[in-house]
């Protein structure tokens, strides 16, 4: 994108963010997260049976699944179920979501049960994995809060909040929260998952058009940290009315 200049918002600004809690009635926790034109439904379902590899260990598990509706993109995507297998991208993203959430949960306090996270992209315009992580935390917190209020858990096993955002270099300019045109035409980009205390869970970085320096990486991380701070406040606001 040699002539691209972002004009719709500042280089260090998020897209318009909206998180609607309790978006679906038939699950323990849910929300719709909207990051600009990217929209993801996130749900959390409690299963009172821990996975087999944890039986008898007095600890729980959090896992995630991720998918995109066929019409979530400009050209219809074939359902992965009809292809008979998940793509490598899908498997990578759902593992990332699961890892990100497990990093902020005390599994012993969760007890011998698992929480199943589902992230379904209904409209995609870049940043679906980061939006999924940010929304999934809200759904998880709602589900866990229900376990506590119902007396099933004596204390909340969630240690702190977690959120994620992208940043990238487009036409030599570091930008926060890339939309699809920016993401597809960037020089380099990163996806960063960070806790409320500022600890990094994961950094995924790739040079798409040109390698980037450690100094540029530092600028992208700083941009992401700013954006994640704002996303954490959106999460708090959504949970305060949940």
Curated annotation (Swiss-Prot):
Catalyzed reactions per annotation: tRNA(n+1) + phosphate = tRNA(n) + a ribonucleoside 5'-diphosphate
Keywords per UniProt: Nucleotidyltransferase, RNA-binding, rRNA processing, Transferase, tRNA processing, tRNA-binding
GO biological-process terms attached to the record: rRNA catabolic process; rRNA processing; tRNA processing
A single GO molecular function term of this UniProt record: tRNA binding
Stored PROSITE patterns: RIBONUCLEASE_PH (PS01277)
Binding of phosphate, residues: 89, 127-129
This enzyme's EC code(s): 2.7.7.56
Coiled coil: none
Top-tier EC class: transferase
Gene3D superfamilies: GHMP Kinase, N-terminal domain (3.30.230.70)
CDD domains: RNase_PH_bact
Domain of life: Bacteria
Plastid keyword on record: no
Keyword Flavoprotein: no
Subunit structure: Homohexameric ring arranged as a trimer of dimers.
Role noted for this protein: Phosphorolytic 3'-5' exoribonuclease that plays an important role in tRNA 3'-end maturation. Removes nucleotide residues following the 3'-CCA terminus of tRNAs; can also add nucleotides to the ends of RNA molecules by using nucleoside diphosphates as substrates, but this may not be physiologically important. Probably plays a role in initiation of 16S rRNA degradation (leading to ribosome degradation) during starvation.
Record HAMAP family: RNase_PH (MF_00564)
Sequence similarity: Belongs to the RNase PH family.
Name assigned to this protein: Ribonuclease PH
Annotated organism of origin: Neisseria gonorrhoeae (strain ATCC 700825 / FA 1090)
Lineage: Bacteria, Pseudomonadati, Pseudomonadota, Betaproteobacteria, Neisseriales
């Amino acid at each position: 994108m040699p002539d691209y200049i972002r004009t719709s918002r500042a280089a260090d600004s998020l897209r318009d963010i909206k998180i609607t809690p309790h978006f679906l009635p038939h699950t323990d926790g849910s929300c719709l997260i909207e990051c600009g034109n990217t929209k993801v439904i996130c749900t959390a379902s409690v299963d009172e049976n821990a996975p087999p590899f944890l039986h008898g260990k007095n600890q729980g598990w959090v896992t995630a699944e991720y998918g995109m509706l066929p019409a979530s993109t400009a050209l219809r995507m074939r359902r992965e179920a009809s292809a008979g297998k998940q793509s490598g991208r899908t498997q990578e993203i759902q593992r990332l979501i699961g890892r990100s959430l497990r990093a902020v949960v005390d599994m012993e306090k969760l007890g011998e049960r698992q929480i199943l996270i589902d992230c379904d992209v209904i409209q995609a315009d870049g940043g679906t994995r980061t939006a999924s992580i940010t929304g999934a935390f809200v759904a998880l917190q709602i589900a866990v809060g229900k376990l506590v209020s119902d007396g099933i858990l004596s204390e909340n096993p969630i240690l702190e909040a977690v959120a994620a955002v992208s940043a990238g270099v487009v036409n030599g300019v570091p930008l926060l929260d890339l939309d699809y045109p920016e993401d597809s035409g960037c020089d380099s980009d990163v996806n960063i998952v960070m806790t409320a205390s500022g600890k990094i869970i994961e950094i995924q970085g790739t040079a798409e058009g040109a390698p980037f320096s450690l100094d540029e990486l530092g600028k992208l991380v700083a941009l992401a940290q700013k954006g994640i701070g704002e996303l954490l406040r959106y999460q708090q606001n959504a949970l305060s009315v949940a």
